[in-house]
């Protein structure tokens, strides 16, 4: 059997000023108790595919590129903290697992919660001839992952007999927020871009996908 554990709250704060205690508790309860329920329910021969997140590194104070899987997590907010806790408990469970640390996932979805992800939000604004705001000038660097590649990789990991009890970064490209906005501008010149001094959680970081590519996934 294969279990793809996708349950979780995605309507989350991206900076401290946007968080609130009630929502944070809900995020943690669904993530931590929910994952424990999954671990307690599956048998030893079952393979668990778990999507974690790049934001477990949101506490990095300086720009860091090509972070590898053995880098110590430094979560701050409820969502990233609960994902880091999930990873720890999955590893300690003695169940068969593959953890995929996703970059910012972009692509078509009927889930409106995912519109808040930067590349999806910028695409929506561009389609409406709107204005993209670049917080802190758009200098933040991010690793992105196309939705189709996430689905392909989950299938690949679930079906692989050789890959067990491993953690992988799942990303395709790394770009600055400003570069994403400029791509949108090229596609739709009618939209506009402005810079602001709004808060960003960090200066950005990127994940290395070398370990993943060594498995044969393309």
Which residues does each PLM region occupy?
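NAD(P)H-binding glycine-rich loop region in Rossmannoid oxidoreductase-like domains
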Residues: 1-30
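Helix N-cap/beta-alpha junction loops of NAD(P)-dependent oxidoreductase domains
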Residues: 10-15, 58-60, 108
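Residue-level signal for the nucleotide or nucleotide-sugar donor/cofactor binding architecture
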Residues: 30-33, 70, 77, 113-117, ...
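Conserved internal alpha-helix within the Rossmann fold of NAD(P)-dependent oxidoreductases
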Residues: 35-38, 87, 154
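C-terminal substrate-binding subdomain of Rossmann-fold SDR/epimerase-dehydratase oxidoreductases
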Residues: 130, 135-218
């Amino acid at each position: 059997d294969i279990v793809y554990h996708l349950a979780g709250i995605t309507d989350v704060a991206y900076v401290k000023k946007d968080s609130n205690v009630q929502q944070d508790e809900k995020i943690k309860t669904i993530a931590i108790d929910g994952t424990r329920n999954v671990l307690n329910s599956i048998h030893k021969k079952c393979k668990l595919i778990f999507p974690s997140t790049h934001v477990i590194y949101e506490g990095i104070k300086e720009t860091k590129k090509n972070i590898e899987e053995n880098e110590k997590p430094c979560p701050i907010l409820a969502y990233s903290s609960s994902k880091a806790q999930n990873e720890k408990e999955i590893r300690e469970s003695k169940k068969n697992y593959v953890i995929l640390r996703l970059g910012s996932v972009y692509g078509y979805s009927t889930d409106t919660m995912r519109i808040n992800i930067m590349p999806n939000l910028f695409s929506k604004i561009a389609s409406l001839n709107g204005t993209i705001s670049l917080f802190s000038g758009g200098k933040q660097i991010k690793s992105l992952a196309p939705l189709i590649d996430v689905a392909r990789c989950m299938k690949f990991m679930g079906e692989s007999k050789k890959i067990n009890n491993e953690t992988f970064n799942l990303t395709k490209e790394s770009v600055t927020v400003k570069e994403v906005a400029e791509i949108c501008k090229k596609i739709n010149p009618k939209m506009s871009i402005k810079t602001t001094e709004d808060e960003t959680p960090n200066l950005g970081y990127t994940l290395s996908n070398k370990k993943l590519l060594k498995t044969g996934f393309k």
